[in-house]
């Protein structure tokens, strides 16, 4: 299977997000990479579903709360930027203060 670097990155994000989702479901608090992957994968899937950039920017702030992540993680993540593929092309989605 021949994959571009971008496709490999998306698969890596998805794999990390799947792990984070399972850990969250077991009641574990997410660490930094897990939180980033969890939100990033949701943004990528939302773009694939046809949501707009502004919808995804807002949606990204609703996915995790401070109770879902380890202590100090919310303060470490000021923004998350994801290059997502939309029906009309690739766009950069920036989620400011994603963990409320």
UniProtKB/Swiss-Prot annotation:
It is found in: Cytoplasm. It catalyses: urea + 2 H2O + H(+) = hydrogencarbonate + 2 NH4(+). InterPro entries: Urease_gamma (IPR012010), Urease_gamma/gamma-beta_su (IPR002026), Urease_gamma_sf (IPR036463), Urease_subunit (IPR050069). Pathway: Nitrogen metabolism; urea degradation; CO(2) and NH(3) from urea (urease route): step 1/1. One of its GO terms (biological process) is urea catabolic process. It is an enzyme of class 3 (hydrolase). GO terms for molecular function: nickel cation binding; urease activity. One of its GO terms (cellular component) is cytoplasm. Pfam families: Urease_gamma (PF00547). Its EC number is 3.5.1.5. Keywords: Cytoplasm, Hydrolase. It comes from the Bacteria. Heterotrimer of UreA (gamma), UreB (beta) and UreC (alpha) subunits. Three heterotrimers associate to form the active enzyme. PANTHER family: UREASE. Belongs to the urease gamma subunit family. This is Urease subunit gamma. It comes from Cyanothece sp. (strain PCC 7425 / ATCC 29141). The gene is ureA.
């Amino acid at each position: 299977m021949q994959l571009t670097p971008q496709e490999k990155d998306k698969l890596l994000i998805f794999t990390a997000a799947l792990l984070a989702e399972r850990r969250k479901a077991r009641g574990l608090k997410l660490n930094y990479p897990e939180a980033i992957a969890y939100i990033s994968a949701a943004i990528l899937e939302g773009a694939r579903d046809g949501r707009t950039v502004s919808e995804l920017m807002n949606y990204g702030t609703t996915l995790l709360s401070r109770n879902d992540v380890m202590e100090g993680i919310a303060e470490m993540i000021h923004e998350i930027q994801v290059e997502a593929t939309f029906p009309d092309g690739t766009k950069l989605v920036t989620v400011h203060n994603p963990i409320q």
